[in-house]
């Protein structure tokens, strides 16, 4: 099992390119099921989750070709299997995103209940509620969501909570439904907007994406299209937290600063110097960061996917920060591992109190989920001595060659196998 060996204490300097967003790429790949014509996607990140999605689509009969430049060409003109099996779904919750497209185009689907990061229940009940409102008959059978519909019919749907994957699933189902669908309490995330922009290129009629009310007028069929996946705002934020904790001066190319308002505001508050252009961000930190608190919220609030990384920065900051996790339960599993590095953190329910220390010291730590992995890497970069991060398969689910990019910025970080660390 691979690990990351980090020798901390070196500031980060230089520039790297931000990859395409994982949370946009996954639903966009699943949207290939909505048409028999080719879909050409650029800026698709090389991640375990995108590879798993491509394997899942391939199992269904979707043909996919991946080029070295991040371009993926998909064609779903020979789909012969409408089931998403447990062995593929168990590692990735986003695999539920095939449900809406399969049901909309083929009238049936059998999708295993999903897995993924162990950071809360994240139930699929809102997906089921919305698809049922569109006329689907849905049952849970032997661990599978089994759905059938002759043709979906437009409806007004208000989810009980804001759900990103729920909005995406219902959006993909609604584009081929008969009549008009209104999604109330819809997610506003840039990744939802990116999916909608692709669907519009494919011939869908969508208005209001980026607001909490999306209106979809269904069409009979969609056609092929060419689309570039939006830049990953979480990867960009992670690298900026890293330079905030370790110090230095970095530039991120291919970024989307207009999607990162809440994160950039927090980093400025922490003492980073931030400069932005249309597709780049420069972040510099000279000296010790200031402690900065945050409350996670749906977009455009501070993203739950940035909570662990900000906490890692706060561990070496001057002062005390209070972080409140409002989106997921059980999303403080990185705290125990940060404390192994010398962090001073107390947890009370959904609230974490982080008292900054002058220095962390390297140790062996274990990743528990995707963003927790990133927080441990950030802490390792800021720590004195050597840090060994175990179970980095979590990191590989959502970061495209993170250690390669960090080395390009001057970090002392290497991927090693279990044998090399024995």
Swiss-Prot record:
GO biological process: cell division; cell wall organization; peptidoglycan biosynthetic process; regulation of cell shape; UDP-N-acetylgalactosamine biosynthetic process
Annotated UDP-N-acetyl-alpha-D-glucosamine binding sites: 93, 122-126, 305, 327
Enzyme Commission numbers on file: 2.5.1.7
Locations listed in the record: Cytoplasm
Residues reported in the UniProt entry to bind phosphoenolpyruvate: 22-23
Keyword Cytoplasm applies: yes
Top EC category: transferase
Catalytic activities: phosphoenolpyruvate + UDP-N-acetyl-alpha-D-glucosamine = UDP-N-acetyl-3-O-(1-carboxyvinyl)-alpha-D-glucosamine + phosphate
Name of the molecule in the record: UDP-N-acetylglucosamine 1-carboxyvinyltransferase
Name of encoding gene: murA
